[in-house]
Design a protein with these regions (language model features):
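Exoplasmic/lumenal beta-rich domain surfaces
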Residues: 1-2, 6, 157
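Core AdoMet radical
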Residues: 1, 11-28, 38-56, 64-95, ...
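Flexible glycine/acidic-rich beta-alpha junction loops that bind and position SAM and/or redox cofactors
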Residues: 117-121, 137-166, 183-185, 192
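Radical SAM enzyme core and accessory elements
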Residues: 172-224
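Alpha-helical packing segments of well-folded alpha/beta enzyme cores
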Residues: 3, 33, 94-97, 101, ...
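Distinct, well-ordered alpha-helical segments
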Residues: 29-35, 56-63, 122-126
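Catalytic cores of alpha/beta
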Residues: 117-133
């Protein structure tokens, strides 16, 4: 409450409000804050979201009252691969919400993807879909988190790394004038240049499948 009081008392100097998570559309204090912020055209509301909210979500509805909104969508695959990687999320709902936001004249969209063994091959497709079909203003690619060595793309087979590298180089050439995308892709290519021989990711996903009743090997047969 003290933070909300401080922000609202000093809101005339605000240039941007950044809502992240957890999932910001589920954090009740965000609604309390947003209701007290004037809907100024020179104030950017940035939102990082898993895109699983219902369209009548009160926080989403309050966000949409602002004239300048930027939604960053967490996208680690498409279709069944998205559903597998982002457990509990649903690709169809994601796209429904993306298209809902597309229809809002005050909203810009961008996407964020984690580069790891399960997204490496699909990354160019994901970028193209959001940049060309959705009209994203940008796309960020994050490296695999620390402590997740076994999920890093350096551990892919030489054959797959070669294919991924070729596709990423082509995608780099396509987006070379977008400094953020180009820089992120360069980092992905550098990751592929590292030596890695761990196949622990196979056991990692096998163990998840035992618990969840899923089958990563069916979705990614080339990695098995």
């Amino acid at each position: 409450d003290r933070i909300i009081e401080f922000v609202t008392a000093n809101q005339s100097g605000l240039k941007e409000i950044y809502l992240s998570g957890g999932e910001p559309t589920l954090i009740k204090y965000n609604l309390k804050l947003l209701k007290q912020i004037k809907k100024r055209a020179d104030l950017i509301i940035r939102v990082n979201s898993n895109m699983q909210w219902k369209q009548d979500n009160k926080i989403v509805q309050e966000i949409l009252k602002f004239p300048n909104v930027l939604f960053t969508c967490s996208i680690d695959g498409t279709g069944e691969k998205f559903n597998y990687i982002r457990r509990g999320a649903n690709w169809n709902r994601t796209i429904e919400n993306v298209k809902f936001l597309q229809g809002q004249p005050n909203v810009d969209l961008r996407a964020n993807t984690v580069f790891f063994v399960l997204t490496a091959q699909q990354l160019p497709e994901i970028i193209d879909y959001f940049m060309e079909e959705i009209g994203s203003v940008d796309h960020t690619i994050n490296p695999c988190g620390m402590g997740q060595y076994h999920l890093r793309c350096r551990n892919l087979s030489s054959e797959i790394k070669s294919l991924v590298r070729e596709n990423l180089n082509n995608t780099f050439e396509k987006y070379k004038h977008n400094l953020n995308i180009a820089g992120n892709l360069k980092n992905c290519i550098l990751e592929l240049d590292n030596d890695g021989s761990s196949v622990e990711y196979k056991e990692y996903f096998d163990n998840i499948d035992i618990l969840q009743g899923t089958d990563w090997r069916k979705l990614y047969p080339e990695l098995t």
